[in-house]
Amino acid sequence: MSDLTLERTFPHPPEKVFAFVTRTEHLLSWWGPEGMGVREHELDLSRPGAWSSTLVNAEGGLHKMSGEVLSVDPPRSVEFTWGWHDDKDVRGHESRVRFEIEPDGESGSKFRLIHTGLPDDESAANHDRGWTSCLRKLERLAG
């Protein structure tokens, strides 16, 4: 199993960053790597329960993932399971994602994305590239 951790700093208080990374209206602006959009979704990470999204790339290829929001501790953290679906819509290997937010200075926040339980180093590298791209979009939105 492989894990990855990414960190960013935002010039906003934890409450605002938490909203950016959990609420549907904000998630849809940065969810998915650059060049991909959200085609279908049940995407609300602000409360426990099931979630899913289908991304579409520039060529029209679909990429579905889903999971369960396990814990929500506003404005500090949210944790959820993560699994990709294959072409027959069968959900594959399950991993976990955790977003952690803490105050940084008077009005900023440190954001940490921790993705654990990835099946191997190649998967971790692919997710690192994907999440890094997503976070660039989030930085433009929330920066």
PLM features: residue spans?
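Hydrophobic pocket/interface hotspot
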Residues: 17, 27, 51, 69, ...
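Hydrophobic/aromatic beta-strand elements that line small-molecule binding cavities or substrate pockets
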Residues: 8, 41, 65-71, 95-103
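A short, structured loop/turn motif at beta-sheet edges
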Residues: 14-15, 70-77, 100-110, 143
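Short amphipathic alpha-helical signal-transduction/dimerization elements
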Residues: 135-143
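Hydrophobic ligand-binding cavity/cleft-lining segments
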Residues: 1-37
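Glycine-rich portal/gate segments that line the openings of hydrophobic small-molecule binding cavities
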Residues: 39-81
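Beta-strand/loop substructures that line and gate deep hydrophobic ligand-binding cavities in soluble
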Residues: 81, 85-132
